[in-house]
A protein has these predicted regions:
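Generic enzyme active-site microenvironment
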Residues: 2, 96, 118
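Active-site/ligand-binding loops adjacent to catalytic centers
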Residues: 2-93, 134-138
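Short, glycine/acidic-enriched loop or turn micro-motifs at the edges of active sites
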Residues: 7, 101, 126
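Catalytic phosphate/nucleotide-handling subdomain of diverse soluble enzymes
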Residues: 15, 105-138
Length: 138
């Protein structure tokens, strides 16, 4: 399973959800899914998270998506920020905003009672404190 940044929403023009909005194209010499115009020009992506603000996905991820071997979820800025704040309050861990997207996607997924879920809690949220504060006005 993978999570993409939906920014302000996939229908707003301010998103980075390549599997939702992208088409096959070439970027940096690799054929992959790419957010682009009809004539192949890269579309400016948007995400509150700088690490997810990219107009494409890697060729391996594109292949996994196209062959149905991976499920991709898209998460808005607001949902990611709420998940990051919730993790901070419940566990005392401030996640990087990139990782907060993964926690927010849990609400979209279905699990069995005996499933084991692993989330790679990468990055440090202290670098994102200003963004969390601006977003939540805490």
């Amino acid at each position: 399973m993978a999570v993409e940044a939906a920014g302000k929403g996939n229908d707003t023009g301010e998103s980075a959800a390549t599997t939702v909005l992208g088409k096959p194209g070439v970027l940096h010499g690799s054929r992959t899914l790419l957010m682009q115009t009809e004539d192949g020009q890269v579309v400016e992506p948007y995400s509150i998270s700088a690490g997810l603000d990219y107009p494409g996905i890697g060729p391996v991820h594109a292949h996994l998506y196209e062959t149905g071997r991976a499920q991709f979820y898209s998460v808005t800025d607001d949902d990611a920020m709420r998940a990051g704040v919730q993790l901070s309050r419940l566990e005392g861990i401030i996640p990087a905003i990139e990782t907060a997207h993964a926690f927010a996607a849990l609400n979209q997924m279905k699990f069995n009672n005996d499933d084991v879920v692993v989330i790679n809690l990468s990055g440090r949220g202290d670098k994102d404190l200003d963004t969390y504060i601006q977003w939540g006005k805490y």
